[in-house]
Design a protein with these regions (language model features):
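Acidic, Mg2+-coordinating phosphoryl-transfer loop and its flanking beta/alpha structural elements
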Residues: 183-219
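Substrate-recognition "cap/lid" segment bordering the active-site pocket of phosphatases
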Residues: 108, 129-181, 187-189, 211-213
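Conserved small/polar residues in nucleotide/adenosyl-binding loops
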Residues: 231-240
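Catalytic-core regions built around general acid/base machinery
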Residues: 114-125
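N-terminal helical cap/lid subdomain that shapes the substrate entry/recognition surface
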Residues: 3-113
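Glycine-rich phosphate-binding loop signature in dinucleotide/nucleotide-binding domains
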Residues: 3-4, 124, 173-176
Length: 241
């Protein structure tokens, strides 16, 4: 990256700061174990087709709900329980409890090696903001203190790669796109979205995947050690106190 002042760094979360796929699978298992324990009849009365229909109906009735993953999951479970004959208050209670089981596992993440060190450095030297389409809780994970702000899809009623995440970060950071850097694992949601807003970009590729997009990436980091070497941040020049 050219030697220049970077004042704003935005970070994706899932599969950028920590591996996510296994955690989501285990979270889903925990949720459905709880539901099956409380409502064992679900296995013979509810199938994937019914669950899909419930999801489609929820989004048709409230298109914005798809950006609030916490509420969306709770509403899906609630509708399933109502279909099984539960009373409204019972369905609400157990959907909240089921989601709690999901969320406990969802936030038990292990940061990639070197990630915490770079968070400390970026927090010291820049405006650091997280941009996520998901619903991880940085407070529970224990890294919220490193971020000036967190921006989720719920906050902007949009998913990356659309511009709202990136534009809101620029507004919060009070920075220009050319002073901004986004780091993320997804070629489309992260790199494509950030590039369309004229951010500098680092493709975080710890899985050593092949780049299949037409437009080449700007920089690639296969570890957080690589990412540090690419940022070239100038301490004491990057943020005015």
């Amino acid at each position: 990256m050219p030697r220049q002042i970077i004042k704003l760094v935005t970070l994706d979360l899932d599969d950028t700061l920590w591996p996510n796929k296994k955690g989501i699978i285990e979270s889903e298992k925990a949720l459905w174990r709880f539901v099956n324990l409380k409502f064992p009849e679900i296995e013979r009365k509810i199938n994937e087709e019914k669950i899909t229909a419930i999801k489609v109906n929820l989004v048709e009735n409230n298109p914005l709900i798809k950006f609030d993953l916490t509420r969306f999951r709770k509403e899906v479970i609630k509708e399933i329980l109502l279909h099984l004959g539960a009373q409204e208050n019972e369905a609400i209670y157990y959907s909240n409890e089921a989601f709690s089981e999901f969320f406990k596992i969802r936030n038990k993440v292990k940061l990639f090696p070197g990630a915490k060190n770079i968070l400390e450095r970026l927090n010291r030297d820049t405006n650091l903001i997280s941009l996520s389409n998901g619903n991880a809780d940085l407070g529970i994970i224990g890294i919220a203190k490193f971020f000036k702000a967190t921006i989720s899809s719920q906050d902007v009623s949009s998913n990356k790669p659309a511009p709202p995440h990136f534009l809101k970060a620029l507004k919060i950071g009070g920075c220009k796109p050319e002073e901004s850097l986004h780091i993320g694992d997804c070629p489309i949601n992260d790199i494509g979205g950030a590039r369309n807003c004229n951010f500098h970009t680092i493709w975080f590729n710890c899985e050593k995947r092949k780049w299949d997009e037409i437009v080449p990436y700007e920089y690639q980091a296969k570890s957080w050690k690589d990412a540090v070497s690419y940022t070239h941040l100038r301490a004491h020049e990057t943020r005015e106190d």
